[in-house]
Amino acid sequence: MVVSADPLSSERAEMNILEINQELRSQLAESNQQFRDLKEKFLITQATAYSLANQLKKYKCEEYKDIIDSVLRDELQSMEKLAEKLRQAEELRQYKALVHSQAKELTQLREKLREGRDASRWLNKHLKTLLTPDDPDKSQGQDLREQLAEGHRLAEHLVHKLSPENDEDEDEDEDDKDEEVEKVQESPAPREVQKTEEKEVPQDSLEECAVTCSNSHNPSNSNQPHRSTKITFKEHEVDSALVVESEHPHDEEEEALNIPPENQNDHEEEEGKAPVPPRHHDKSNSYRHREVSFLALDEQKVCSAQDVARDYSNPKWDETSLGFLEKQSDLEEVKGQETVAPRLSRGPLRVDKHEIPQESLDGCCLTPSILPDLTPSYHPYWSTLYSFEDKQVSLALVDKIKKDQEEIEDQSPPCPRLSQELPEVKEQEVPEDSVNEVYLTPSVHHDVSDCHQPYSSTLSSLEDQLACSALDVASPTEAACPQGTWSGDLSHHQSEVQVSQAQLEPSTLVPSCLRLQLDQGFHCGNGLAQRGLSSTTCSFSANADSGNQWPFQELVLEPSLGMKNPPQLEDDALEGSASNTQGRQVTGRIRASLVLILKTIRRRLPFSKWRLAFRFAGPHAESAEIPNTAGRTQRMAG
């Protein structure tokens, strides 16, 4: 007997199965959630255990050593697993990138194959039409050639599409085209730059030419001479050379001055090599005479030189350099002779034009003044000698005296005379009894006569680490020179100068219009007394207004006292002359003019302040003693 299933029971069974599935799914979800929670707790616990194990290991707990090792071991294993996972993830990332690139290449290859199929299909069709001609006339001739050309083109296109280097070639072709375009665009620019440079070069050259022309020619209409100075310092020796150059728009020749006094042997070698100009040489009226005043220093001594040469009739300016370097032994030999033959040394000196040394020069600003109460019939010849110590730099500044002079027919052979204007004189009054120290200020005589004007010159030479500078002043006389011997005798003595505080100040400048005209040939009649130059002595003589002669006064330079208002140099000239004396009657006269023009607009030459003091021994003193640096004394007659 067969029992049939009840449909209600079957429905109940299906409902039970569905409920069971739902319950199981809910339980599975709960289990997954619990697993995740437990996993989180495990990770937290593992981290806590790892930290505790590290602390225990730090405190060296032997009891929990096994636990610590196990925990740390587990931690190391977990770290290794994590590192491995990271490495695998990185590799998967790389592989994924590689797969993408390969997939891209496959896509491109599929595209090429499709194009290749199309090209091959067109080629096949073309060949079929070519091989199965309908008209034999058309198969030959122009139509055949066109079909063959078309087939050749299709075959090339197919090969080009199927070649794997197609993309690379296309890229290269595009790059080449881009480069060509860039070159075409950039090519005009360099040409334009070259053209502009070619245009600029002549302009620069023209500017340079203009600069050189402006430097070589005198910009002013007054024909003011240029000056150039160069100061060289070598070890403990200082050579200071002031070279004044007078330029003309047509200047062609220039000679500079060089004074390197190192020792006597060097001077003798220079004398043997360099030509020495003659002592007595009559120069034509077309040339101005030249004068150079040198201050020679030997071993830690300062040498100051001033040179000038100017020619008014010739467009070329001749510049000569004369050097006077003399030792004490030579001076003693020269004193007994009738004429003084100072040594001459010549040497080139590189002089940079339009340059004024702005560094501090330890020098002196010495301004001569004529002794007060001088009679108009007699003016003394006097010169000063400066000695410097402690490696100080000295500069000889010469006061300008202009003179108007006519030739005297009754006396010895005439010589070219240099007539110049003489500025007015402002003399200082010096009390005889109360004043022991006075400031020397520049002063010049009032009137100028046509009679002979004597000059004096001093060549200063130093020894035992002394530096000297010579100050030469020419005093004109207002009356005719007396016939016979001179009433005043010129003796030689030496004054000591010590420089302890010589500083330059830009406010102190050399007095304007400084010129020196020096004539060593003392010619004043038949009974002219012969006077020998000495590089270490200087003398002073003067006549008072009452007719009595003043005694020789001693000139002392006090370095500790500074001149409050030193003179200033402007756009004028410093002229001087250096000449040689002859025998008893001077037959020739060498005149030289030293021109020093300093333009205050462009440059200034600073000098230190000096204070000059006179020590008067009294109006009726027979003689005065002046000690020199070595402790020796010399007497000068009153």
From Swiss-Prot:
Gene Ontology CC annotations of this record: cytoplasm
Tissues in which the protein is found: Expressed in testis.
Residue ranges of domain Olduvai in the record: 174-261, 326-399, 400-503
One Pfam family recorded for the sequence: Olduvai
Subcellular location field: Cytoplasm
Family (UniProt): Belongs to the NBPF family.
More info: Encoded by one of the numerous copies of NBPF genes clustered in the p36, p12 and q21 region of the chromosome 1.
Protein known as: NBPF family member NBPF4
